[in-house]
Amino acid sequence: MNHALRRATLGLSPGLRASRLQQSFAKHQIPAVYRCEAASTPLQRAFTTSRCFRQETAAESEKDDAARREEQSERARKRQARNVTSGSSAQTLENDRPWHRADSGADPDAPKDVPENKDMKKGRLLTTPTRLLKLILPMPFHPEQEHVNRPVEGDVDDAGATVEPLALLIHPHQPLSYLERLIQAEIPPVQYKGREKLPDIVFRAEADQNEQDGRKDDNKKKDNANVASYSGLGHEGPTNKEANWVRWSGSTEIGDFIRDAARGREFAINVEGFDRELRVAVPSFRDRTYYMRMTLRRMSRDIESMSKVKNECDTLAHQGAHRLAQGGFAALAGWWGVVYYVTFHTQAGWDLVEPVTYLAGLTTVMGAYLWFLYISRDLSYKAAMKVTVSKRQAALYQERGFDQNRWDQIIHEANNLRKEIKIIASEYDVDWDEKKDLGGEEVKKVLEEEKQGRDGTKVTEGKDEDDGPGSSDKIKKKQ
């Protein structure tokens, strides 16, 4: 039989012989995973390696797709088994619910910004370098708890475990209803009449209602009966065990709510179906303006160092302008002396001096007129001083390495920060010690001068460039 097979093989062409041998080797020697079909090509060498790899990849992808479909079908069956409601208001089911998320696998020894679940009994409202506020809220719900009003049974492992605290970034101008939606999306639903619904969230804060309870002192004036009291201390204030609480509307802005709640140490968040309320410490004025004041202090140090260089350059520029003015007076006095000497002490006399002085005076007037056309400003001593001082200042700034653009920017930002802090201080009804954060009276004076304009080198708002008799304010007063 082997002899006959050998004769049949020798009777084939070389190309067919090679393909037949390769097929036989692939069928009997290579495992079944690496089997492939090699098309016979006459008079050509058969290459099947890349085709084998493609078939292997296709087989693996088919297996992965089959496993994925099986897993999806199994998950769908589990979801269908746990499906207890069909209402449109129901939240996502158990596997997709955010309160069932496991804690992150971070290093347990690494420092944490948020305390442990068991140690965090009260929420916190923190300020950020931006205008946003960071609300850290404890979540007293078990990871396997499906409804707020139905706690987990006692046979569950770690019955006292709770979900990790929740962090939310909110803007002071957003309403409380927006914060309510954020909290509702992160807590379990409530079971109500056999259906799931989102639990209602109520925000309550301490209120000044002593007048209604009759505990107000009779010695106080009746004029202040309808005036709310503010302290701005927040969580830094004293504890008031007999505090009066009031419910706030969801349309109230978060910033207004926090500002009013700052009269007490904390505000409360009530969740429907949960027997306890969530307390959150209220930020004080110092907390709300912490990053603003730190930024202002850093800017104040830069302003103080840059103002020294700027004052030196400005002083030298003004001294140079005054010396130039004095030099002009000396030139006029010298010209007067030359005319006097030539007229009365030489043989040239007035016949020669008269046309010379006439032409010199006319040339001076023409030059002054051309200079006025060039600068397009009022022809006055103040305008001439401005041009001279500004050019000298620019040269000195460049020589000393003073950046005028950066100076203007940092002054503008510092004044804006001062304005924002003053607004918050007025809202909290506290007195802000501006000198302490600015680093002294000198920086405050520099900011005020740069804001209002000084030395005639900066234009103030609502005024012309020259505060002379033709200024806009004086013209309005005359009218």
Swiss-Prot record:
Topological region Mitochondrial intermembrane: 345-354
Pfam families membership: MCU
Going by the UniProt record, its keywords in alphabetical order are: Calcium, Calcium channel, Calcium transport, Coiled coil, Ion channel, Ion transport, Membrane, Metal-binding, Mitochondrion, Mitochondrion inner membrane, Transit peptide, Transmembrane, Transmembrane helix, Transport
Bias (Basic and acidic residues) occurs at 60-75, 94-122, 206-224, 445-462
Q: Where is this motif: Selectivity filter?
A: 350-358
* Positions of Ca(2+) binding: E354
Q: Which reaction does it catalyse?
A: Ca(2+)(in) = Ca(2+)(out)
Record region (Disordered):
56-125, 206-238, 445-479
One Gene Ontology CC term in the entry = uniplex complex
Family to which the UniProt record says this protein belongs = Belongs to the MCU (TC 1.A.77) family.
Q: What's the protein here called?
A: Calcium uniporter protein, mitochondrial
Species this protein is from: Gibberella zeae (strain ATCC MYA-4620 / CBS 123657 / FGSC 9075 / NRRL 31084 / PH-1) (Wheat head blight fungus)
